Design a protein with these regions (language model features):
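Cell-wall polysaccharide-cleaving catalytic domain and substrate-binding groove, primarily
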Residues: 2-49, 146-147, 158, 170, ...
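Flexible, low-complexity segments enriched for small/polar residues
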Residues: 3-6, 11-25, 247-248, 252-274, ...
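Short, compositionally biased low-complexity segments
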Residues: 8-16, 56-61, 76, 162-166
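N-terminal accessory alpha/beta regions
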Residues: 24-122, 127-130
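A ubiquitous short alpha-helical element
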Residues: 70-74, 92, 155-158, 234, ...
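Active-site substrate-binding loop specific to GH73 endo-beta-N-acetylglucosaminidase modules
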Residues: 84, 120-317, 324
């Protein structure tokens, strides 16, 4: 029996598997069954388009650099980190491999690394992308051996007779079992011994340094043996709790912040029985009836990246000065490649506070109307009652910059099937409107379609997907 989705359910699917759907795409896919739409989403994400950059002198060994080149390398590192951020943001807004990029964004938070080492960061990002719809166990192994993770969690300093427990702790607490689940402090200490000797070469390739490894017998999670780091990861994957913990995180991210234990057990069993095949668990999730339950639609607060990409993508927005993307990410508290700590971004209601709410509500107007934003990087306006208004305005103007963008309104408007208020509201907004929002919408002029759309995207309800 062919099951069809209504427009609201299709939009829900496309927001959760990506960053929304254009009216043009909606017209095409609404003719398909639910299974056909989902199969198409997977087919479009078959390929993995790696990010690539030229790193110049950063590829040289630090010992081979002159004093002047070392200073240049420090500056280049910061520059390349900014370029990497902008490069990935552009890929998020333009890619056809939307589900793969959305899952990469999820695991970018799960395997949270905060470094100013662009070569290591782009490598880790590409490792995650390659495995995003494949096997979680393979991803975990390769991520664990990546230069970024080895640097960030100090595993290069983990040596026999002087073990460093950082990675062993986080691989259990954050990457597999979850905090305080089935492991003890002794398990962490023993596992740390197994991860000794893990390192990488100058070109970023993993290397096992035998002289640094502890070859003694270890006992981890009730198993005893002369374990290596690879053995520990296999032992962690043998625990069904690992599958459950990952499925809980996937559920919160793709379905609802409120967990349904029955759904979790269904996903956990499928994930574990498939030997951690990510496509299997996503297929089951997106094809289930409960995924489209009204209580799961329009209930999640968009992350800053989801919000920014969701505004930029349908209008094919081009930023004259892409650095504004970094500024907006910083102000909204989600800067790609700079999570707050190893636990990643807290998400959910934590995205909204007094400092972020007003900017979030103004973001559509700033982006689609080239609005003015206060650019307070290094300079503040001094509070001086004697300062002349002229001087004040001169200083203030230096702090304000236009978010200079080009939005393709023509293509967006030409693909609309209807320009009446109800149709546009259903296209732009996922949840039901509040009474206050309904009053605002009823007072808007639907004949000014461009302004009406911006006003819709400035409603609190647009913050939800």
């Amino acid at each position: 029996m062919m099951i069809s989705l209504n427009d609201k359910q299709i939009q829900h699917l496309y927001w959760r598997t990506g960053f929304g759907i254009s009216n043009h795409e909606l017209k095409i896919v609404r003719k398909l069954s639910k299974d056909q739409i989902i199969d198409q989403i997977f087919i479009e994400s078959t390929k993995a388009s790696a990010l690539s950059m030229d790193f110049g002198i950063l590829e040289k060994h630090p010992k081979d650099l002159s004093v002047a080149e070392r200073k240049q390398a420090r500056q280049l590192r910061n520059k390349k980190m900014s370029e990497l951020n902008i490069l990935w943001f552009k890929q998020l807004t333009t890619t056809k491999e939307v589900l793969r990029e959305k899952v990469t964004l999820f695991f970018h938070d799960h395997f949270a690394v905060r470094l100013r080492t662009p070569r290591a960061c782009i490598h880790l990002n590409n490792v995650i992308r390659n495995h995003a719809l494949e096997n979680f166990g393979d991803m975990l192994m390769e991520v664990s051996k990546s230069p970024a993770m080895l640097i960030f969690l100090n595993n290069r300093q983990n040596r026999k007779n002087s073990p460093n427990e950082n990675f062993a702790r986080e691989v259990m607490e954050l990457f597999t079992l979850g905090r305080d689940n089935q492991y003890t402090e002794t398990d962490i200490k023993e596992a740390a011994r197994a991860f000794t000797g893990w390192n990488f070469t100058q070109n970023g390739s993993y290397i096992f340094r035998k002289n640094h490894h502890d070859y003694g017998v270890k006992t981890v999670l009730g198993k005893t043996g002369n374990f290596t780091g690879e053995d520990i990861i296999k032992i962690l994957l043998e625990q069904k709790q690992t599958a459950r913990f990952i499925c809980q995180k996937l559920y919160r991210y793709f379905v609802n912040d409120i967990i349904n234990q029955n759904h979790i057990e269904i996903l956990t069993n499928a994930f574990y029985d498939s030997n951690y095949n990510l496509k299997t668990v996503f297929n089951l999730m997106f094809k289930s009836d409960w995924f489209y339950d009204s209580k799961n639609i329009g209930t999640k607060i968009k992350s800053p990246i989801e919000l920014m990409v969701g505004i930029s993508k349908p209008f094919k927005v081009e930023y004259e000065n892409p650095k504004v993307l970094l500024y907006l990410q910083r102000r909204l508290n989600q800067m790609l490649f700079f999570p707050p700590n190893v636990a990643g971004w807290p998400g959910g209601k934590a995205w909204i506070d007094n400092s972020t709410l007003m900017l979030r509500l103004k973001l559509a107007s700033l982006t689609l109307n080239s609005g003015v934003i206060e650019w307070q990087d290094k300079i503040d306006i001094p509070e001086n009652p004697m300062m002349s208004q002229q001087v004040y305005q001169k200083i203030k103007s230096k702090l304000q910059k236009k978010v200079k963008t080009e939005a393709d309104w023509d293509i967006f408007l030409s693909n609309l099937e209807s320009k009446n208020k109800i149709a546009l509201t259903h296209l732009i907004i996922q949840p039901e409107l509040s009474k206050a929002a309904n009053r605002v919408v009823s007072n808007l002029d639907e004949n000014d379609t461009k302004n009406f759309i911006i006003e819709l995207m400035s409603l609190p309800e647009y913050q939800l997907c």
